[in-house]
From Swiss-Prot:
Protein name: Probable ADP-ribose 1''-phosphate phosphatase YML087W
InterPro entries assigned to the protein according to its UniProt record, in alphabetical order: Macro-like_dom, Macro_dom, Macro_dom-like
GO biological process, one term: tRNA splicing, via endonucleolytic cleavage and ligation
The protein's assembly and partners: Homodimer.
Cystine connections: 128-136
EC number: 3.1.3.84
Annotated substrate binding sites: 23, 55, 80, 90, 148, 195
UniProt xrefs under SUPFAM superfamilies: Macro domain-like (SSF52949)
Native species: Saccharomyces cerevisiae (strain ATCC 204508 / S288c) (Baker's yeast)
Known catalytic reactions: ADP-alpha-D-ribose 1''-phosphate + H2O = ADP-D-ribose + phosphate
Enzyme category, top tier: hydrolase
Record function comment: Highly specific phosphatase involved in the metabolism of ADP-ribose 1''-phosphate (Appr1p) which is produced as a consequence of tRNA splicing. + phosphate.
Hydrolase recorded as keyword: yes
Amino acid sequence: MTGSLNRHSLLNGVKKMRIILCDTNEVVTNLWQESIPHAYIQNDKYLCIHHGHLQSLMDSMRKGDAIHHGHSYAIVSPGNSYGYLGGGFDKALYNYFGGKPFETWFRNQLGGRYHTVGSATVVDLQRCLEEKTIECRDGIRYIIHVPTVVAPSAPIFNPQNPLKTGFEPVFNAMWNALMHSPKDIDGLIIPGLCTGYAGVPPIISCKSMAFALRLYMAGDHISKELKNVLIMYYLQYPFEPFFPESCKIECQKLGIDIEMLKSFNVEKDAIELLIPRRILTLDL
């Protein structure tokens, strides 16, 4: 699927692509079910939650499962800063795409260098000439490398500071994956973020993933400027000069309570205070 997008390929003004959330941890997949509006979960054209291994997901895609139809996908690698594929979901990528030869090729595509946590690099698998990778690619066109740890030497999560070590890194990784998704894909496969070696509790990870996904799916029902404001308050960087009057007027039109927005506490408050569910169903 290539070429320019027309209005029929847009959802709320953003490119329609199926989001496939995939994880082996049932706690994670159940939390996704709870935190993402049912209107999206029930409409598998836009979102699917897969409880199981990457291999089982790929098997269903290879069989032409109607839920996973599509010709070109990207998959998120939420690993380390050096591109090693030694654990967690990255280990599944390692095994699926060809083991050590694939890891060597993948790291070469990343320049063999350090990539900062919070960065994102798109790797085109069509450039890989490894026989096993070519054989198993099955529509996976890209890997989006989104480091969540420098190295898996110790958990990043500190229960004394859940915002900076949990909510924020997960949101940044999810937002980066969505913002860097190539334009010529039908779908994006994303595992649970930071719930493995990074040690972020699933309830925190899933909340930030759901918030990023809601912002993305809201499309042009929420202006870019207001999205910036919502992110600023979700991550608890309250700075009034970055909250323009136009966004306050927009909040009133969308039914977002400005005072509740300004006092939003990510540890206690529901994300519906920032993005009312009705906004997400306007074009479904």
